[in-house]
């Protein structure tokens, strides 16, 4: 819990610094430092054995000054009030790519890996019923997150449509294509990270082709990312999952590993010759991509990182102390709120398509995504260079400005 409180505290600290650089006073910071709304719900679910189990769920809505809140729903045993910090990050992501949203986030304390598909369905529907008064296509729009997918979004949409007199596909994003989902949504987060890597590489006169890349994490985002980079000619010299890491200085066969990973992204347990996560971060490489969990790069290991570029595909993988160490060493650090903004961007595209009834091809979606992210990268990189600040602070300045200005015009602070 202390680690998660540190995530909240460090996020608030950077937001405060960003707002002061923008000229906003402490009154505006007090408005923005925590979610406007935070709902805790209890969800009774009939299990397959006939017993009733009650689950705890959350939904945080950080700020809706700009527009509806937007953010994922995660099913995980460790879900708690961390969703408050995650909702703040969603506000930043939406501001960075100029979306008409504030940030939201939700979750249920559960382990779907230990539940039947019918139990997961009943839990998903129960969650929607419990939060139905504060969500909707013009209020708060959920999406997939950790251990949730398009099928769970479909159940949630169906449950909401039974309570609402109108058919509202725009209530939720990340749906199956046949129910109004967008082309390219399932790979959008990984593609967004690839675009961030491409742009960072350009700033260091590199290309993805031939670059030696290490990826921590081989789940949905990490595996899609590895495949994209591998197909572009990158040499993936290291990957990891929850059980260990694999290393080959000549490059791993990503297609071979993808064929053998299980549904939870595990593959290293099939090999005897593995290395630790600590050793993974110390590998000789050009680009390091932490795509797993928070607080992986700290002041204890930041000096050992050999990569010239670090691109954060996970939420909060680098501590503030490590950020300073890497920046002082000249490492180009692309922050999570920029690098992982691809998912919410294509979720926005899905919402727009639902509202208009006009649907785009995957090529159109990817082209619009690239346009958004390249523009955001340029803005943040140039701001960091002009003000001589790290890219994380620059991203927070860009990300929070829209919400703070909207709140000021509304007379909220």
What residues fall within each predicted segment?
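General beta-strand structural signal in soluble alpha/beta enzymes
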Residues: 85, 139-143, 166-171, 238-241, ...
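Adenosine-phosphate binding glycine-rich loop
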Residues: 2-6, 200-201, 304-413
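Glycine-rich phosphate/diphosphate-binding loop of Rossmann-like nucleotide-binding domains
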Residues: 181-282
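Glycine/serine-rich phosphate-binding loop and adjoining beta1-alpha1 elements at the start
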Residues: 95-209
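Glycine-rich, N-terminal phosphate-binding loop and its surrounding beta-alpha-beta segment
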Residues: 41-51, 55-112
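Rossmann-like adenosine-cofactor binding region
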Residues: 244-333
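Short, Gly/Pro- and small/polar-rich lid/capping loops
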Residues: 2-42
């Amino acid at each position: 819990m202390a680690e998660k409180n540190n995530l909240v505290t460090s996020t608030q600290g950077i937001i405060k610094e960003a707002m002061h650089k923008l000229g906003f006073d402490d009154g505006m910071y007090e408005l923005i430092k925590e979610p406007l709304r935070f709902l805790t719900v209890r969800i009774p679910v009939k299990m397959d054995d006939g017993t009733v189990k009650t689950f705890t769920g959350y939904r945080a809505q950080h700020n809706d000054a700009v527009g509806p809140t937007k953010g994922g729903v995660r099913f995980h045993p460790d879900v708690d009030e961390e969703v408050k910090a995650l909702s703040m990050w969603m506000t930043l992501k939406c501001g960075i790519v100029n979306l008409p949203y504030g940030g939201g986030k939700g979750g249920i304390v559960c382990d779907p890996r230990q539940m039947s598909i019918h139990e997961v369905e009943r839990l998903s529907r129960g969650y929607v019923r419990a939060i139905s008064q504060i969500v909707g296509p013009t209020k708060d729009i959920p999406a997939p997150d950790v251990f949730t997918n398009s099928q769970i979004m479909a159940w949630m949409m169906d449950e909401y449509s039974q309570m609402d007199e109108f058919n509202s596909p725009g209530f939720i994003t990340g749906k199956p294509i046949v129910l109004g989902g967008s082309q390219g949504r399932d790979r959008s987060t990984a593609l967004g990270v690839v675009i961030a890597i491409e742009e960072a590489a350009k700033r260091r006169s590199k290309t993805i082709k031939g670059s030696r890349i290490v990826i921590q994490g081989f789940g949905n985002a990490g595996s899609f990312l590895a495949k994209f980079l591998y197909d572009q000619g990158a040499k993936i010299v290291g990957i990891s999952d929850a059980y260990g890491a694999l290393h080959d200085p000549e490059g791993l066969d990503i297609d071979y590993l993808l064929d053998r990973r299980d549904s939870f992204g595990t593959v290293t347990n099939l090999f005897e010759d593995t290395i630790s996560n600590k050793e993974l971060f110390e590998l000789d490489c050009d680009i390091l991509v932490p795509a797993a969990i928070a607080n992986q790069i700290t002041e204890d290991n930041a000096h050992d990182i050999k990569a010239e570029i670090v691109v954060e595909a996970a939420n909060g993988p680098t501590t503030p102390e490590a950020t300073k160490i890497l920046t002082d060493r000249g490492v180009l650090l692309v922050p999570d709120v920029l690098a992982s903004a691809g998912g919410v961007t294509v979720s926005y595209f899905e919402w727009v398509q639902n509202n208009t009834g006009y649907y785009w091809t995957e090529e159109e979606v990817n082209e619009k995504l690239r346009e958004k992210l390249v523009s955001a990268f340029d803005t943040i990189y140039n701001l960091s260079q002009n003000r001589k600040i790290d890219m994380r602070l620059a991203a927070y300045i860009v990300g929070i400005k829209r919400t703070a200005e909207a709140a000021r015009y509304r007379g909220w602070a």
